[in-house]
Amino acid sequence: MSKIKGNVKWFNESKGFGFITPEDGSKDVFVHFSAIQSNGFKTLAEGQSVEFEITEGAKGPSAANVISL
């Protein structure tokens, strides 16, 4: 699976999800906190640069293996 770079559009810590805007201009991708690859509290900040893979979830594409850049 290829890695894609993008920026966090928004992330709601209390709900544990948000969206990432890919750098290639494609449609925003859903991200769940469980896909964030970090220790401790898993969260993302608006505008943060990330790298991720896209998987096909039940409700459409979602981010997997999200890492901060």
Curated annotation (Swiss-Prot):
Top-rank taxon, per record: Bacteria
Subcellular localization is given as: Cytoplasm
UniProt keyword annotations, A-Z: Activator, Cytoplasm, DNA-binding, Transcription, Transcription regulation
Give the matching CDD domains: CSP_CDS
| Entry GO terms, CC | cytosol
Where the record annotates domain CSD, the positions are 6-66
Q: Which SUPFAM superfamilies match?
A: Nucleic acid-binding proteins
Tell me if Transcription regulation is a UniProt keyword of this record: yes
InterPro entries noted in UniProt: Cold_shock_CspA, Cold_shock_domain, CSD, CSD_CS, CSP_DNA-bd, NA-bd_OB-fold
Coiled-coil annotation reads none
Protein name listed in UniProt: Cold shock-like protein CspE
Q: Which gene specifies this protein's sequence?
A: cspE
